[in-house]
């Protein structure tokens, strides 16, 4: 089955100016999504859709990435990703339709290619129409109706560990059968979720999110080597373990 990835990357961002091209731990944020798409074992085509000349110029530096200029009507704040993804994919199907379309957000730099490939492998072996990246985040939550009345979004008050699974979309990726991708949506009748590791789930929306992601990407590994024997004892080994896990 042929798989195409669409990376939607607007030039404007109210929360973080030039977010997609701002350096995240030494390289533009969008580079992480492009890198994952190119490294995937299942992806055949990588498309970057943007209204920004800067983003398009950067994406064009990659040999196997097609940079597509986005019309201004598709770059407005109120426009959802559905028509954007449809526009990008439909412009690249002169030689035939793709079987699967993956929307890969540039705002999830912690996502690993191993997780992406695991999700694609799961989807391709299933009968699902759509697969959405999620994290399990059970909490006692409340909702509000149109009249302003609040009501619980749970049936029974329980400890967090006893609550039913509650999936929250991470925004990292959304995988769809090609026939489900239209200007009005990307969800089919059969929708599944793929739980990503908590450490890969951050979606950059605020400056705080940015700082968190950058600090995690900038972490350095420290190797502890501890030698011990019967005469020397192993007390120092336990102290080293305390340091390693502190």
Label each residue range with its predicted role.
Residues 15-19, 25, 228-239:
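A short, glycine/small-residue-rich beta-strand->loop->alpha-helix junction that serves as a flexible
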Residues 83, 87, 108-197:
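Conserved core of the sugar-phosphate nucleotidyltransferase
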Residues 182-195, 199-202, 207-221:
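Catalytic donor-sugar/metal-binding loop of nucleotide-sugar-dependent glycosyltransferases
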Residues 33, 238-246:
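Short amphipathic alpha-helix
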Residues 3-49:
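N-terminal glycine-rich phosphate-binding loop and ensuing alpha1 helix
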């Amino acid at each position: 089955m042929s798989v195409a990835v669409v990376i939607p990357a607007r030039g404007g961002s109210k929360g973080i100016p030039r977010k997609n091209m701002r350096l995240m731990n030494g390289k533009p944020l969008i580079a992480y999504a492009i890198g994952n798409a190119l490294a995937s074992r299942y992806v055949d085509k990588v498309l970057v859709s943007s209204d920004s000349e800067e983003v398009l110029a950067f994406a064009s530096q990659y040999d196997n990435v097609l940079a597509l200029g986005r019309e201004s009507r598709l770059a407005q704040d109120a426009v959802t990703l559905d028509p954007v993804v449809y526009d990008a994919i439909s412009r690249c199907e002169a030689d035939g339709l793709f079987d699967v379309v993956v929307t890969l957000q540039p705002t999830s730099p912690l996502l690993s290619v191993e997780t992406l490939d695991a999700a694609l492998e799961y989807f391709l072996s299933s009968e699902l129409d759509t697969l959405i990246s999620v994290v399990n985040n059970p909490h006692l939550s409340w909702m509000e109706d149109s009249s302003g009345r609040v009501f619980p979004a749970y049936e029974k008050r329980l400890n967090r560990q006893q609550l039913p699974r509650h999936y929250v979309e991470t925004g990292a990726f959304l995988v769809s059968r090609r026939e489900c991708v239209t200007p009005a949506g990307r969800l089919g009748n059969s929708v599944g979720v793929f739980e990503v590791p908590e450490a890969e789930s951050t979606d950059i929306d605020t400056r705080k999110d940015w700082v968190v992601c950058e600090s995690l990407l900038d972490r350095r590994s420290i190797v502890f080597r501890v030698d011990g024997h019967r005469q020397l004892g192993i007390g120092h080994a336990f102290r080293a373990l305390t340091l390693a896990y502190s």
